[in-house]
UniProtKB/Swiss-Prot annotation:
Function description: Together with the chaperonin GroEL, plays an essential role in assisting protein folding. The GroEL-GroES system forms a nano-cage that allows encapsulation of the non-native substrate proteins and provides a physical environment optimized to promote and accelerate protein folding. GroES binds to the apical surface of the GroEL ring, thereby capping the opening of the GroEL channel.
Gene Ontology MF: a single term: ATP binding
Native source organism of the sequence: Shewanella piezotolerans (strain WP3 / JCM 13877)
Keyword presence, Endoplasmic reticulum: no
Subunit annotation: Heptamer of 7 subunits arranged in a ring. Interacts with the chaperonin GroEL.
InterPro entries: Chaperonin_GroES, Chaperonin_GroES_sf, Chaprnonin_Cpn10_CS, GroES-like_sf
Family annotation (HAMAP family): CH10
One of the GO BP terms on file: chaperone cofactor-dependent protein refolding
Name recorded for this polypeptide: Co-chaperonin GroES
Name of the gene this protein is made from: groES
Alphabetically ordered keywords of this record: Chaperone, Cytoplasm
GO CC, alphabetical: cytoplasm
Subcellular location: Cytoplasm
Amino acid sequence: MNIRPLHDRVIVKRSEVESKSAGGIVLTGSAAEQSSRGEVLAVGNGRILENGSVMALDVKVGDIVIFNEGYGVKKEKIDGEEVLILSESDLMAVVG
């Protein structure tokens, strides 16, 4: 994937969600929930602080993260794959 996020931005590929209910019913449309987990594909250089220094991000490529998909999260198609571009502040946790 040929993309390099700027500053404190992170590129995440959403994880697939099981599309069956606990009872074995196949869920479609709005009943099928989207995952709020994904794999970090790329990270920016870091957040630029008021004094001009750069604070490195806490996440790295390959991390599995839980994110808050709200205002400011951008969906994009890169090389045929849908990815999310978001700020590190939209990440809530690193899994594992």
